[in-house]
Structure formats: structure tokens, C-alpha cells
């Protein structure tokens, strides 16, 4: 038996090369390169690949607002419920950023409306904190509970008040009567 690699076998990446390649893949998600992600996924790249912070490709693409890349990842069975190491979900990131189209895309593909981070914060709470009135309307229309409390007993309305988010305070006060 020979110690050499046959010519038809690909060369194995070194650990450093693999780490560099992985970082390039995560950058493609951040940049929203849907075509490259589709090509890599079709070659066997795991759809739920995570970086050193626990962020998935889906988390990065959704946070940075790349709906086409998110759709490609979801088509390849990326899980919209995978949280990063801080307990943050893609839907909470999209709500924080104020991206209604992204929130809708994630919900339509299985994201839990009431899914909470480790501290109990939901996407509705994130939207309330940052005056994301359209997202609040959408999430409540889909069944989000405006009376839900985080681990500290804080509701979406409480969070909006704390952050000085006047529009969402008025919206939630009207809704809650």
C-alpha cells in the first residue's frame, strides 16, 4: 500500500485552511450570496453550520437582511429555531433590525412566534423595544402574546416604555385596553 494520495482523490484541507474556508462561507451568508450558498449546500455543506459564536448561516443571512439567501438556506432545511450561544434566534434578530419581510419569511418557514431567548425575550419584545410597529402588528396577528413576560417579568409594553419607544407603547396600550 502506498503512502501517497491517489491523483483522483481531493487533497484534505489543513485545519487552518478549513477555518479560513469556513469564515469565507459565513461571510457569504452575511453578504447574502444566495447563489454561492446554494452551490455549497448542493455539494453537502451543512445547512445548520455554526461559527465560533454559535451563529448559523441562517442567523447571519437573516440578521443582515438577505431574504434570497435565507430562502435558499430554508429550502436546504436550515432550522429557523437554532439559537446562537447567546440564545438569540433569527426571528428575534430580524425583529430587532425591523425587517418585516424577513420576519414573515421566517414565520412562514417554521420560526416559533413565541420562541424566546435564554432571558425569555421574544421577537415581539424585541420589536416593541425598537418601535417596530408593523412587526408588532404582524406578530400579534399571527398569535404572539402581548402579555408574555421575560425571565424578569417584563412584558413587551414594559420593554417599550423602558426603551422610550413611544409608537409601540401607544400601539400596545391601545391593543391591551
Language model features with spans:
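Conserved ankyrin/ankyrin-like repeat signature
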Residues: 36, 68-69, 101-102, 134-135, ...
